[in-house]
UniProtKB/Swiss-Prot annotation:
Name by which UniProt lists this protein: Single-strand DNA endonuclease ASTE1
Keyword line: Hydrolase
PANTHER family: ASTEROID PROTEIN, PROTEIN ASTEROID HOMOLOG 1
A Pfam family assignment: XPG_N
Subunit structure: Interacts with SHLD1, SHLD2, SHLD3, RIF1 and MAD2L2/REV7.
Annotated coiled-coil segments of the chain: none
Protein's GO biological process: double-strand break repair via homologous recombination; double-strand break repair via nonhomologous end joining
Positions of disulphide bridges: none
Region (Interaction with SHLD2): 351-400
Source species, domain of life: Eukaryota
Function: Structure-specific DNA endonuclease that specifically cleaves single-stranded DNA and 3' overhang DNA. Contributes to the control of DNA double-strand break repair choice by antagonizing BRCA1-dependent homologous recombination (HR) and promoting non-homologous end-joining (NHEJ). Recruited to the single-stranded DNA ends by SHLD2 and cleaves the 3' exposed DNA ends, therefore inhibiting DNA end resection (necessary for HR) and promoting DNA end protection (necessary for NHEJ).
Length: 679
């Protein structure tokens, strides 16, 4: 993020460029993207298992509780999608490649920093629970953050070195020196958080009192996320950049030092820019000047007034308005009710699918959820005025396509994906919210290939995850086994268990059973973290499930939540689900695990019964019985009744030792066998 090497440079000179703060009794504008990455990577969370979202949520809650204790009022500003120019695409692709390498490293036991897939959604859910004010910008948030902080005369909290360039009235506090875990007290009563604040005045003073207005030119010459022109190397190689007196630390920042010392000789950006252009071929000067000036604008005040959103709920973004998007979409994006994935698809007809810690030798885990995305794309087709106006009714038909940047092996590629043609009343995005709840729910469930009746016994909070699980089970590329399904459903019991434990008026016996089961789950989770090797096939299967859940949630949000959004903070824990997989494979049975808590046992039965009818019959076969399809068909053709009898006998034996729902599975197997022979 930001300018390469600048953050480490200013930190090497922290005594000169930073002042100590005792932060309390103030507003603070927080870079949400930087914060959730920092909390994810600096809190000893295990990143191998696809997200311990409960642990992450606890860390986020503690962070904001520290702020509240110091009477610090946070305003979180999140990045949105890419802007219409898509000028960061090269940078985003480079980062995608880096993430693939880090995900691969994590998958084979190495180190790396890869955010779990749903971390942003979890972060937003915690903000909502804690009633922390937040906004999601239409595109990148940096300028809006700077403008709001200057309006309120308060500091910015981030880790982005771009904030060393912005002229902030009250300064910029880097996250890595923001000691929220080490609250101190003044006179025994007033809490404060020790922090460091970057001083732009001290920075400019260090470089011969250079004009602050030169810093945006420095940023684009040095190379930031927006500009990386090969021709600038011509300037850097020809200009004799003065390094000044450098310490051993300074040698690794020779380009930064040289540029700053060189720029400090000029009175203003115009004079400096003219001198830059002298080193370039004449034929390139005009184009380079235009690009540099345009990039320097990124460090000026934003036209967006976020204070209006926080005070009145009004979000006005000129760039978004110019696209002519429906009002309800703009409002939902600002409130974080729609993901930046949606705005990227809307504005650019291009999305980037993030890599998870998965099996790099298999097709990427997002392939399984592509049909859901095709429905999302179909809903978005008629809402991008700047794109081709090709009609679905044109002859010959020319379906409008979207591009997806996805992982292939350990690299990326761009795939062209056709949107699904939808009924006329579904294809007008501006009127999508006018559809009845029943019709919106029907479209969601039809996409997930799930009957509504299946979900009737399921608690409201789990309807969407169970519908998604049914979708996941129906896809042959999933390769899920029974213990994968069982582990997933057991993990979904955590939220209800916490509700029982915290519910007043529950009988002591019920509460004790819930506490014991919850404690057992915590033990399994802790034990998993001590393990050394990741089961890559299992990891890939659960990455596929998370992709289905993410896209199911995005479709649900786009349809104005016909099913309630699940509480992700208590729905999925990667360490727990992997640990349960290991236990169920070894010796533990679901029956014995749930025997201490009848309420959890009953809920599990509802969840299992809902999903089992969508699972392939093979996953219910005992170990050693899952032969190839051809062998099963051959045996069925030679002796239908004999085969059915053997299957029943083996399954009953498995049921008696392991799972009380086995009889239900036997009935399902017999029906499946009879249906196969009728065909």
């Amino acid at each position: 993020m930001g300018i390469r090497g600048l953050m480490s440079f200013v930190e090497d000179h922290s005594n000169e460029f930073f002042t100590d703060l005792k932060l309390r009794d103030t507003k603070i504008v927080i870079d949400g993207y930087a914060l959730f990455h920092r909390l994810c990577f600096s809190s000893n969370l295990d990143l191998r298992y696809g997200g311990d979202y409960d642990s992450f949520a606890d860390v986020v809650q503690k962070f904001f509780e520290s702020l509240f204790a110091c009477n610090i009022c946070p305003y979180v500003v999140l990045d949105g999608g890419c802007d219409i120019s898509d000028k960061k695409l090269t940078t985003l692709k480079d980062r995608a490649r880096e993430k693939i390498q880090m995900a691969h490293s994590l998958s084979v036991g190495g180190s790396g920093y890869v955010c779990p897939l749903l971390i942003r959604e979890v972060f937003i859910q915690v903000l909502i629970k804690l009633r922390v004010c937040f906004v999601q910008c239409f595109s990148e948030a940096d300028r809006d953050i700077m403008t709001l902080a200057n309006h309120w005369n308060c500091p910015v909290l981030s880790s982005d070195s771009d904030f060393c360039i912005f002229d902030l009235k009250t300064g910029f506090c880097p996250l890595n020196s923001f000691q929220w875990r080490n609250m101190n007290t003044i006179k025994g009563t007033q809490n404060y958080i020790p922090a460091k604040c970057f001083s732009l005045d001290a920075f400019c003073h260090h470089f011969s009192n250079m004009n602050k207005a030169l810093l945006p030119l420095f940023a684009v010459l040095c190379g930031n996320d927006h500009v990386n022109l090969p021709i600038m190397e011509t300037f850097l190689s020809k200009a004799r950049l003065p390094l000044g007196a450098t310490s051993s630390k300074g040698r690794r920042h020779h380009r930064i030092l040289g540029l700053l010392n060189w720029l400090s000789h000029f009175a203003n950006p115009t004079e400096a820019l003219d001198n830059v252009l002298k080193y370039l071929p004449k034929k390139d000067r005009e184009n380079v000047k235009e690009l540099l000036c345009c990039s320097m604008e990124e460090y000026q005040q934003s036209q967006v007034k976020l204070q209006d959103f926080f005070q009145c709920g009004t979000y006005v973004c000129p760039d978004a308005l110019n696209l002519g998007l429906p009002e309800w979409v703009l409002v939902a994006l600002a409130k974080g009710q729609l993901s930046p994935f949606i705005s990227d698809a809307l504005v650019l007809r291009r999305t980037i699918l993030p890599t998870q810690v998965e099996n790099m030798q298999q097709p990427n885990a997002h392939r399984i959820s592509q049909p859901i995305r095709q429905i999302i794309y179909g809903l978005l087709l008629n809402a991008s005025p700047h794109l081709d106006k090709t009609s679905w009714n044109a002859l010959p038909p020319q379906p409008l396509a979207f591009s997806e940047v996805e992982r292939i092996n350990k690299n990326i590629r761009t795939s062209i994906i056709d949107a699904v043609e939808l009924a006329k009343d579904h294809s007008d995005l501006s009127r999508l919210t006018e559809l009845s709840l029943r019709r919106r729910q029907m479209l969601l469930l039809e996409t997930l290939k799930v009957k509504q009746t299946i979900l009737e016994p399921i608690p409201t909070s789990l309807k969407l995850p169970i519908a998604v699980s049914c979708y996941w089970l129906q896809h042959t590329e999933t390769k899920a086994k029974l213990h994968h399904l069982q582990s997933l459903l057991l993990t979904m019991l955590v939220g209800p268990l916490i509700a029982i434990i915290n519910s007043p008026g529950k009988e002591e016996l019920q509460e004790d059973g819930a506490k014991m089961l919850y404690a057992e789950f915590q033990r399994v989770k802790a034990q998993t973290r001590l393990g050394t090797r990741l089961d890559l096939d299992t990891a890939h299967i659960f990455c596929q499930w998370q992709s289905c859940l993410q896209m199911g949630m995005y479709l649900n949000q786009l349809l104005s939540t016909p099913l309630p959004e699940p509480d992700l903070t208590r729905l999925y824990s990667g360490s727990l689900v992997h640990g349960l997989c290991q236990q169920l494979l070894a010796s533990t049975s679901v029956e014995s695990l749930l025997s201490i808590c009848p309420e959890a046992k009953q809920l599990y039965e509802y969840l299992f019964n809902a999903t089992r009818s969508y699972a392939p019959a093979e996953i219910f076969l005992p170990k050693g019985r899952s032969n190839s399809k051809k062998k099963r068909q051959k045996k069925q053709n030679t002796s239908c009744s004999k085969n059915r009898g053997r299957t029943t006998a083996h399954t009953k034996c498995w049921y008696e030792g392991n799972n009380r729902f086995g009889l239900l599975m036997v009935e399902n197997l017999e029906e499946h066998s009879e249906a196969s022979n009728i065909e």
